[in-house]
Curated annotation (Swiss-Prot):
Lineage: Bacteria, Pseudomonadati, Pseudomonadota, Gammaproteobacteria, Enterobacterales
Entry superkingdom: Bacteria
InterPro entries in UniProt: Baseplate_J-like, Phage_Baseplate_Assmbl_Protein
Annotated gene: jayE
Name listed for the protein in its UniProt record: Putative protein JayE
Something else known: Encoded by the e14 prophage.
Family per record: Belongs to the Mu gp47/PBSX XkdT family.
Pfam annotation, one family: Baseplate_J
Coiled-coil positions: none
């Protein structure tokens, strides 16, 4: 269940079902039941108007009640907005089916763990690490192909562990399923022409680049970063001011976009 929460409010304030709530990026939610404040707290159940992961939000993310309620601030915060998954894209599904067709389970080979992990909703990539926690142990690192945040939710990690465990040898007693650590990469760019549209296009290209090249034990090469920027629609020329050196990604990491500074 998802909620919007207010704290430090008067008791007896009521938000009715069907009220519209909006996030800063214009994603909308609707209250699914009536709720009344008590003990200075108002917590109302909500559902996102759009299907998939777009409705997920970190606890504390600002939300706005579109229709004001007398005595209640319009601004509240997200509370437990997790667990939304995008419908698997056709090409991703096709690739997974083909992979399963060509890769017959072999009783716990490295590729088996990857195939099993991808059978869990929200997981499109996985890596197997033998002897991760000692001789005989198997580590499985899981991730999605989300361009903004490929690190799965804790609930997805739990689901993967529960799914793989019975399939793995010895009922998965030596199995460790875990999520990657985000390796945040910041950029400093001078671009010509410099418009909001071109900045957005460059941002999109960099996200796609990090998904392709920012895999565990990979290396982000400065030349390929520049190549990605040059592929942005409308970009004529640019200067990559940072990073200036290639960036190595550790075996337990995935590269994710940090801050882009524009000059």
């Amino acid at each position: 269940m998802w909620y919007m929460r207010w704290e430090g409010v008067s008791d007896g304030l009521k938000v009715t079902a069907g009220s519209v709530i909006q996030r800063d990026d214009l994603v909308q939610y609707t209250t699914t039941d009536d709720a009344t404040s008590s003990g200075g707290v108002l917590r109302v159940p909500i559902a996102c108007s759009s299907a998939g992961a777009v409705g997920n939000a970190d606890d504390g993310t600002a939300l706005i009640l579109v229709t004001p309620v007398n005595g209640l601030p319009s601004s509240g915060v997200a509370d437990t907005l997790t667990g939304g998954f995008d419908t698997e894209e056709l090409e991703t599904w096709r690739a997974r089916v083909i992979e399963r067709y060509y890769w017959t389970p072999q009783g716990g080979a490295d590729g088996d763990y990857v195939v099993w992990a991808k059978e869990v909703p929200g997981i499109t990539r996985a890596w197997t690490y033998r002897h991760l926690m000692g001789t005989g142990t198997v580590g499985v690192m899981i991730a999605s192909s989300d361009l903004i945040n490929p690190i799965p939710e804790e609930s997805t990690e739990t689901a993967a562990r529960q799914h793989i465990g019975p399939l793995a040898p010895v009922a998965g007693s030596d199995l460790y399923v875990f999520r990657p650590v985000a390796h945040t990469v910041d950029f400093h760019i001078r671009v010509t022409p410099d418009t909001p549209e071109i900045r957005a296009a460059i941002t999109a290209e960099l996200r796609s680049f990090l998904l392709r090249d920012g895999y565990p034990q990979g290396e982000l090469k400065v030349s390929r970063i520049s190549e990605a920027i040059s592929g942005a629609n409308g970009e004529y020329s640019h200067q990559l001011l940072a990073p200036v050196d290639n960036i190595s990604i550790a075996k337990n990491e995935l590269a994710v976009l940090g801050t882009i500074s524009w000059t």
